[in-house]
Amino acid sequence: MPWISSHMNSSSVLDFFPHKTMAVDIAMKFYLRSPPLRRDRVECRIARKSNEPLRPCIQTTNKTLLSELSNQENKVKKRVSFADSRGLALTMVKVYSDFDDELEIPFNISELIDNIVNLTTVEKERFFLDFVQPSADYLDFRNRLQAESVCLENCMLKDKALVGTVKVKNLAFQKSVKIRMTCDSWQTYKDYDCLYVKDTYAGSDKDTFSFDVSLPEGIQSSASIEFAVCFECEGRIFWDSNKGLNYRIVRQDHRIPSDFESRHYDPVCLSVDQYGSPRCSYGIFPELQTYSGFDKLGPYY
């Protein structure tokens, strides 16, 4: 092989070949003539990679999730059954024996029980008016006042007290009106003074007096309260005793039935005064005699 100088350039190398040669052809020849050790190492690396298993592109489900699904499938489903279907009783009875020691009831519960008992007692001790309101029959009320010079106008029970008004004729300036009350059929009695009520219209020939009398305490269950109105003027005494029957206050259990009014006033026989107005309104509104909604009592004229 001829000797080649070390000072050769690329053009001189290409001129060395007998036929026309490109530089890329020379590079390929040098690459193909690489040392055998390097070529074997590259082939070994390629062979090792070809033996590894291929990984799938789709990932499988998580193992923990698969185990949970399998456990749920293995669980037994719950079922409901009734006692009678198994021959058992549908009800259960428990018997409790009395305690040897007395139970200690809290104070607030004891107080509540006492209040309930007291309310029941108060309900039994309620009183009612056992007479018709005098002013319910206005014509009769006016005639009685003209004839007897005194007449109970109206009254009602309020908080264990009897309150009302009395109408009297203005016979003189000095006059006194009182309520005489008893709870033992007049074996004993007590007088309660009435107070003068100033008339709205001056120059009237009639005066009005009011009273507020507390009912006696400790009245026997079989006893009733009776009262009458006394009017004193210029040494003369006038009485309104409900036409001799007295005004009575009775307990709830001794109250006369509601047909009491029908025996005293017949709705068919209602009288009419000279002005054409009905003389009796009690047959239309009988509940007014015990109505406790009137806070202000006053005269009708």
Curated annotation (Swiss-Prot):
GO terms for molecular function: protein phosphatase regulator activity. Pfam families: CBM_21. It comes from the Eukaryota. Transmembrane segments: none annotated. Residues 142-250 form the CBM21 domain. A motif (PP1-binding motif) lies at residues 79-82. GO terms for biological process: glycogen metabolic process; regulation of glycogen catabolic process. The keyword Manganese does not apply. GO terms for cellular component: protein phosphatase type 1 complex. Keywords: Carbohydrate metabolism, Glycogen metabolism. The N-terminal region is required for binding to PP1, the central region is required for binding to glycogen and the C-terminal region is required for binding to glycogen phosphorylase, glycogen synthase and phosphorylase kinase. Interacts with glycogen, PPP1CC catalytic subunit of PP1 and PYGL. Associates with glycogen particles. Forms complexes with debranching enzyme, glycogen phosphorylase, glycogen synthase and phosphorylase kinase which is necessary for its regulation of PP1 activity. Acts as a glycogen-targeting subunit for phosphatase PP1. Facilitates interaction of the PP1 with enzymes of the glycogen metabolism and regulates its activity. Suppresses the rate at which PP1 dephosphorylates (inactivates) glycogen phosphorylase and enhances the rate at which it activates glycogen synthase and therefore limits glycogen breakdown. This is Protein phosphatase 1 regulatory subunit 3B. It comes from Xenopus tropicalis (Western clawed frog).
